[in-house]
Curated annotation (Swiss-Prot):
Belongs to the universal ribosomal protein uS2 family. One of its GO terms (molecular function) is structural constituent of ribosome. It comes from the Eukaryota. The keyword Ribonucleoprotein applies. It is found in: Cytoplasm. Keywords: Cytoplasm, Ribonucleoprotein, Ribosomal protein. GO terms for cellular component: cytosolic small ribosomal subunit. Coiled coil: none annotated. This is Small ribosomal subunit protein uS2. The keyword Ribosomal protein applies. Required for the assembly and/or stability of the 40S ribosomal subunit. Required for the processing of the 20S rRNA-precursor to mature 18S rRNA in a late step of the maturation of 40S ribosomal subunits. Component of the small ribosomal subunit. Mature ribosomes consist of a small (40S) and a large (60S) subunit. The 40S subunit contains about 33 different proteins and 1 molecule of RNA (18S). The 60S subunit contains about 49 different proteins and 3 molecules of RNA (25S, 5.8S and 5S). Interacts with ribosomal protein S21. One of its GO terms (biological process) is ribosomal small subunit assembly.
Length: 263
């Protein structure tokens, strides 16, 4: 009989956060983020309290579920590492995803074609997504943000303290948030593990795929080279000037001319 202790959902989630380095902050510290910092390492990097990260994650999931129409939730990531994560989050929760550059005026300028009126905004980084956070303040739209130790909390309603610069950390945070949303909606029971892996939310560099394909092409074995003088032997020049008698090997029937009276 195994003596292995069964982990609670909180312990399991925090263990995954440690693996993906969610707790690793930056050397800079925003004054309003002090409450989420556990300690400071010898190298000056601030360590985030993952217990508070888990609590804020649960709170954010409940706010997302409270929005009746999932399409009224907009997930934004100007950071490349979060582009795939927000697209996958939107796919599984029904939200809208905006990966890449934010068009100015999407929340405030009704004339532009991309104008939207969401009820909730989720951003990957309040610093890189500052334009969308600022517009949400004008439009009175609540904001949920993944905040690092140096992230500004201005106009942010719910801050989820985490490492928002690592691709593994961003992927795991959106995966955990999507999983909790599906649990609260009843799409999957809590007794059942979500069959979607975190790798699906992980950003992949297209250049790495191209380099990998080139390496595979170079490693592919080619046809063996022809042996020396195989199929490539030059014909002797004497044969071209040699005069042969075509009747030497011919049958007697073909040598004799046809009689005229046979026609």
């Amino acid at each position: 009989m195994s003596n292995k202790k069964v982990q609670s959902p909180k312990e399991e989630s925090i263990a995954k956060m440690l693996i993906c380095k969610v707790h690793i902050g930056t050397k800079n510290l925003e004054n309003k983020m002090k409450r989420y910092v556990y300690t400071r390492a010898k190298d000056g990097v601030h360590i985030i309290n993952l217990a508070k990260t888990y609590e804020k994650l649960q709170l954010a999931a409940r706010v997302i579920v409270a929005v009746s129409n999932p399409a009224d939730v907009v997930v934004v990531s100007a950071r490349p590492f979060g582009s795939r994560a927000v697209l996958k989050f939107a796919q599984y929760t029904g939200a809208q995803a905006i990966a890449g550059r934010w068009t100015p005026g999407m929340l405030t300028n009704q004339i532009i074609q991309k104008f939207i009126e969401p009820r909730l905004l989720i951003v990957t980084d309040p610093r890189t997504d500052a334009q969308s956070v600022k517009e949400s303040a004008y439009a009175n739209i609540p904001v949920i943000a993944l905040c690092d130790s140096d992230s500004p909390l201005e106009h942010v309603d719910i801050a989820i303290p985490c490492n928002n610069k690592g691709k593994e950390s961003i992927a795991l945070m959106y995966w955990l948030l999507a999983q909790e949303v599906l649990y609260l909606k009843g799409s999957i029971p809590r007794s059942q593990a979500w069959d979607v892996m975190v790798d699906m939310f992980l950003w992949r560099d297209p250049e790495q795929f191209e380099l990998k394909n080139l390496a595979n092409e170079e490693a592919t074995p080619t046809a063996p080279h022809l042996a020396d003088n195989q199929y490539a032997t030059d014909a002797p020049y004497d044969d071209w000037n040699k005069k042969d008698d075509w009747n030497d090997n011919a049958n007697e029937e073909w040598k004799n001319p046809i009689a005229v009276d046979e026609w």
